[in-house]
């Protein structure tokens, strides 16, 4: 486990290597992560850092939030996140400290977590990649139907977890082992190879890869 940071998905572009190869990259803005609270084994039963980033309009901040940020002595951010710490991590980090993108300077691969784009209510073909049925040859009603969803009198029910139509997307997704292409500490940018979950401007959690 290693310290992660909160970022914002800016969008995708591409960069070129010296030999002319094109690399598709996602640009992630990682502004300073301000520590608002330090969780400890003694008081909370686990070790973690609570951080905020970005800004929030003053009229959108509740009184409890305002008090929490004021106690930490940091500017109010757009949200609060917790990053778990291993036993040997986070020593010396105190409330009010700032964590920046340069902690990824020596990291080769990262895991990126975000909320996937919501797709609304979708059928089995789009949601689960089911095969469509015949368009002709006697089929006139069930072209995109799920087909059979179970057996007969035994068991006489549909099993829990059966893949069917329903709400798709808008859930927590992690993409693992993305190559770090560039760290731009001056502009607080991290460029990773490939796509990451979520829409433009969505919040992301970036951590060093656990499987690297």
UniProtKB/Swiss-Prot annotation:
What is the superkingdom listed in this entry's lineage? Bacteria
Output the PTM entry: Methylated by PrmB.
Q: Which PROSITE patterns match?
A: RIBOSOMAL_L3 (PS00474)
Key words of the record: Methylation, Ribonucleoprotein, Ribosomal protein, RNA-binding, rRNA-binding
Q: Which GO terms describe its biological process?
A: translation
N5-methylglutamine PTM sites in chain numbering: 153
Question: Could you give one GO CC term from the UniProt record?
Answer: cytosolic large ribosomal subunit
Q: Which InterPro entries match?
A: Ribosomal_uL3, Ribosomal_uL3_bac/org-type, Ribosomal_uL3_CS, Transl_B-barrel_sf
Any one Pfam family here would be: Ribosomal_L3
One of the entry's Gene Ontology molecular-function terms is: rRNA binding
List, alphabetically, the SUPFAM superfamilies matched. Answer: Translation proteins (SSF50447)
Entry keyword annotation includes RNA-binding: yes
Q: Does the keyword ATP-binding apply?
A: no
Q: Could you describe the subunit structure of this protein?
A: Part of the 50S ribosomal subunit. Forms a cluster with proteins L14 and L19.
What role does this protein play?
A: One of the primary rRNA binding proteins, it binds directly near the 3'-end of the 23S rRNA, where it nucleates assembly of the 50S subunit.
User: Which family is this protein grouped under?
Assistant: Belongs to the universal ribosomal protein uL3 family.
* NCBIfam families in the cross-refs: L3_bact
What is this protein's record name? Large ribosomal subunit protein uL3
